[in-house]
A protein has these predicted regions:
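Short loop/helix-cap segments at secondary-structure boundaries that form the rim of catalytic
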Residues: 22-23, 37-41, 160-163
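Active-site-proximal loop/helix segment associated with metal-binding centers of metalloenzymes
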Residues: 9-16, 34-86
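Cap/insert and terminal regions of metallo-dependent hydrolase folds
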Residues: 73-79, 83-90, 94-174
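Glycine-centered loop/turn motifs
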Residues: 35, 173-177
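Active-site HxH/HxHxD metal-binding segment of metal-dependent hydrolases
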Residues: 1-35, 48-56, 140-148
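Short, charged, surface-exposed secondary-structure boundary motifs
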Residues: 4-8, 126-129, 178-180
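General small-molecule cofactor/ligand-binding pocket signal
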Residues: 28-32, 43-45, 168-170
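Short, solvent-exposed secondary-structure boundary motifs
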Residues: 20-26, 68-73, 160
Length: 180
């Protein structure tokens, strides 16, 4: 990976996976492009939204290409989607491309389905109260009945989302069992 966080005007800090992992374990890695069916009912869905670099610039996430830094387009990030009898369940790590973009992408991929749950960080720790409340309104429109967030949602954003979404949202913790 070639992922970096911008520390200040001139400094970037590498924040990708440990260098060498991909080459050292190339025989164990299968690269997936586009919508990818892992097995019946389990899919990897990539970003399809154009312009995600705007989000990356706001939260200081960059990639290096030919020695130059560019805002990340998150093309390398995917969501793991399970098709269950109760609806689709989205698993994502930090949702760098925006949780509402991910929801839109999954619904476009499975237009006849509904999303029942979203599990993963929402990467809102640098978002304003207004942005978080607007996201909550968009989430309400989807009919999602369970959201389990990770650390990168941010404490302040979680409190606002809890006010707006009530029992629909809860924080993930070690050892948590998820029942849908």
């Amino acid at each position: 990976e070639n992922c970096y966080g911008k520390k200040n005007f001139f400094m970037y800090k590498y924040n990708g996976i440990q260098p060498g992992i991909l080459t050292n374990h190339a025989d164990r890695i299968e690269y997936a492009e586009g919508d990818y069916k892992l097995l019946d009912g389990v899919y990897l869905i990539p970003h399809k939204t154009v312009g995600l670099e705007k989000i990356a610039k706001k939260v200081n996430l960059y990639v290096k290409d030919n020695g130059k830094m560019f805002p990340d387009d998150f093309a390398h990030e995917q969501s793991l989607v399970f098709d269950t009898p109760k609806g689709l369940v989205i698993f994502n790590s930090c949702s760098h491309g925006g949780p509402d973009n991910i929801i839109t992408e999954v619904l476009a991929t499975f237009p006849e389905k509904e999303i029942c749950a979203y599990v993963g960080g929402l990467h809102l720790y640098k978002s304003s109260e207004k942005e978080v409340r607007e996201l909550a309104d968009r989430i309400k429109e989807t009919g999602i009945t369970k959201i389990i967030t990770g650390h990168c949602t941010g404490d302040e954003a979680f409190v606002i989302l809890k006010e707006e979404l009530g029992d629909v949202i809860e924080q993930m913790y070690t050892g948590m069992e998820i029942e849908l």
